[in-house]
Amino acid sequence: MQNSASEFLKPRLIDVQPVSATHARVSMEPFERGYAHTLGNSLRRILLSSMPGYAPTEVTIAGVLHEYSALDGVREDVVDILLNLKGVVLKLHGRDSVVLTLKKEGEGAVLASDIELPHDVEVINPEHVICHISSGGKIDMEVKVEKGRGYQPVSARTSHDDNRSIGTIQLDASFSPVRRVSFAVESARVEQRTDLDRLVLDIETNGVIEPEQAVRNAARILMDQLSIFADLQGTAVEEVVEKAPPIDPILLRPVDDLELTVRSANCLKAENIYYIGDLIQRTETELLKTPNLGRKSLNEIKEVLASKGLTLGMKLENWPPAGLEKP
């Protein structure tokens, strides 16, 4: 049978119009009616949420214990310094994290270009202002930069407070290199057909990635996610059968092993309680309803169970186990 996908038009014209080094408009046509909206919305979501980037995640400033401090000789308070640090655009080559050092003395502005960089780390916006130092002031800090995707608040990260040194301030991180994406759908025409669409993507990045390359990466991600649907036969995921947790061997022992009085043992067997696993699932109220089993016998049962680390009223999800018979 002929593949129905071949009956649809595919975009043949792709036009990239650079607005600046970090801003471009990418148009594609023709699309069947409705397909430009479908793909435009999908690409926009992927561009905003799934492009890898780099962001400061931890900061240590000499003489500062928390973000609500102030530094002598520095015009901005620590909160403003941290906000300005988030605006520094960095690109790491061949690594996923790095700790950078920033030291400066003397009056003047502290810029992103003042950060000491190894050979494989690049500052995209070196003129970005981090803070201003007054006469006699200085600043000494370490900044941890990590690779990630999307936006990650401090609470979403796996690092724990007890693993950090005193004075380390964690930052909410916006890793996405894509600052803004919008799309528009316009009318397109091919020969006599006028019911077609043109997709126009307007993309602005922070300079870590070119807009055109961001579109390519987003398209690859979308194709990879959809490829599983292209061949559904023989690709069914095996059902995972959860194994029942093992049963404590003591629960499989008969109640006779508890060495109860004859009266108590007979009362339990009359209620079809043959195993310790049967017994611990009964409550005190249920046992007191048993004929000829009084408070004295109940206390005896509780004491014997307690000596083995067990109590009445326990819940067993996989009881009785398969193949368990009356003793």
Swiss-Prot record:
Keyword Electron transport: no
Alpha N-terminal domain (alpha-NTD), as annotated region: 1-233
GO process terms (BP): DNA-templated transcription
Pfam families: RNA_pol_A_bac, RNA_pol_A_CTD, RNA_pol_L
Keyword Nucleotidyltransferase found: yes
Catalytic activity annotation: RNA(n) + a ribonucleoside 5'-triphosphate = RNA(n+1) + diphosphate
Region annotated Alpha C-terminal domain (alpha-CTD), chain positions: 247-327
Enzyme Commission designation: 2.7.7.6
A GO CC term attached to the entry: DNA-directed RNA polymerase complex
GO molecular function: DNA binding; DNA-directed RNA polymerase activity; protein dimerization activity
Keyword entries, A-Z: DNA-directed RNA polymerase, Nucleotidyltransferase, Transcription, Transferase
Domain notes: The N-terminal domain is essential for RNAP assembly and basal transcription, whereas the C-terminal domain is involved in interaction with transcriptional regulators and with upstream promoter elements.
Function statement: DNA-dependent RNA polymerase catalyzes the transcription of DNA into RNA using the four ribonucleoside triphosphates as substrates.
Known partners and oligomeric status: Homodimer. The RNAP catalytic core consists of 2 alpha, 1 beta, 1 beta' and 1 omega subunit. When a sigma factor is associated with the core the holoenzyme is formed, which can initiate transcription.
Sequence similarity: Belongs to the RNA polymerase alpha chain family.
Protein name, UniProt field: DNA-directed RNA polymerase subunit alpha
Organism: Chromobacterium violaceum (strain ATCC 12472 / DSM 30191 / JCM 1249 / CCUG 213 / NBRC 12614 / NCIMB 9131 / NCTC 9757 / MK)
Gene that this sequence comes from: rpoA
